[in-house]
Amino acid sequence: MFDQLESIVGRYEELGELLSDPEVVSDTKRFMELSREEADLRDKVATYNEYKKVLETISDSEEMLGEGGLDDDMKEMLKEELSSAKSQKELLEEEIKILLLPKDPNDGKNIILEIRGAAGGDEAALFAGDLLNMYQHFSESQGWKFEIMEANITGIGGYKEVSALISGPSVYSKLKYESGAHRVQRVPVTETQGRVHTSTATVLVMPEVEEFEMTIDQKDLRVDIYHASGAGGQNVNKVATAVRMVHLPTGIKVEMQEERTQQKNRDKAIKLLNTKVFDYYQQIELDKQNAERKSTVGTGDRSERIRTYNFPQNRVTDHRIGLTLQKLDSILSGKMDEVIDALIVYDQTKKLEELNK
C-alpha cells in the first residue's frame, strides 16, 4: 500500500509540473485530462501526508517516553498524545484504503438526468415531476447548476419524459446510484374512492460526454428544424428555432425547443444526443461484462426496482441496501443526503470486502 502511495505522490508532483508547461496548457484535451488526474490524486496525497505526520508524532512520543527522566505531568501528556495519534492512525489507514479503491472514471463528471413516467399513466407522469423537483432541490443544496434540456409535459402538469443537465463538483459520484425504477404508493389526485395506487417512474443517470470524448459523424445525423410549439416567446410563429436530431445507426432522437434561438437549441441538442449515444454503446459493453464487474449497489439492471416512496406511511425504502426512512416529505423536498451517503458507504464496504478476499 505504501509503495503505491509513494508512487501516487511522485505522479502528483509530476502533474503539477506538466500543468504549468505552456505546451500542455495550449493542448485543451491533454490539459483537461491531466487536470482531472491531478484532482483525483489530490485527496490521496493530502491524506497520505497527514498520515506521515501522525507516524512522526507516534515515533517522537515513543522516543521521549523511552528516554526517561520525565516528570509525571509530562509522561501523562505524552501518553495521551500517543494514544490520540494511534487512534488517528487507524482512522487514516481506513480512509486511505477507501481512497485507493478503484475509482469510477466518471465520478467527477456532470450528468444528464432522464426521468420517464412509466407504469401508471397520469399518476406516473406526476410522480416523474415529483422526482424532478427532488433532484432539482438536492442540486441546489449542493451548489450545482440544474438546467432542463428536454421536456414532454402532460396536460395535468406531469412529465412523460424530461431531461436535465446537472453541473458541478462530483455530481455523477453522488447521483449515479439513482438509475432504476422508482415506485410510488399513494392516493392519486384523480382517485375519488381514496384508494392507494402504485405507479412507477424510471430514472437514468448518464455522465455528460465532452466533445473530445465523442463526436457523432455528420453522415450518421439527421437534423430537422421546425417551429417551436410553445417555448420561445414572440418568435415562435416567425422563426423556426426548434431542433430535432436523430442518430441514424441507433434511432436515438432528441428534440430541443427550450431556447429562443436555433443555435442554442442546436448546441443543447448535440450535447444531449452525444451523451445518449455514448451511453447506449457503453451500456452494450457493460451488459457483456460479468455481474461482478458492475456496481455492487444493485444488479446494474436499469429496469431494477430500486426504491419505493409510500405516502400513507411517509416512508422511503431503498431495496438494494434495506434502508427504510420515515422521512418521505423531507426526501422529496431534496434532503437526500442520508440516502445517498448510505449508498456510497454500502458500495465502498462491499468493494473493500472484495479487495480483502
Swiss-Prot record:
GO terms (molecular function) for this protein are: translation release factor activity, codon specific
Name the principal localization, coarsely classed. Answer: cytoplasm
The record describes its post-translational modification as: Methylated by PrmC. Methylation increases the termination efficiency of RF1.
Please provide an example of a Pfam family that matches this protein in its UniProt record: PCRF
Q: Which domain of life is it from?
A: Bacteria
**Which InterPro entries does the annotation name?**
PCRF, Pep_chain_release_fac_I, Pep_chain_release_fac_I_sf, Prokaryotic/Mito_RF, RF-1
Q: What is one term from the GO cellular component aspect held by the record?
A: cytoplasm
Keyword vocabulary terms for this entry: Cytoplasm, Methylation, Protein biosynthesis
Identify residues that carry N5-methylglutamine.
Answer: Q234
Disulfide topology = none
- Which subcellular locations apply to this protein? Cytoplasm
* Function in brief: Peptide chain release factor 1 directs the termination of translation in response to the peptide chain termination codons UAG and UAA.
The similarity annotation says: Belongs to the prokaryotic/mitochondrial release factor family.
What's the name of the protein? Peptide chain release factor 1
- What species is this protein from? Lactococcus lactis subsp. lactis (strain IL1403) (Streptococcus lactis)
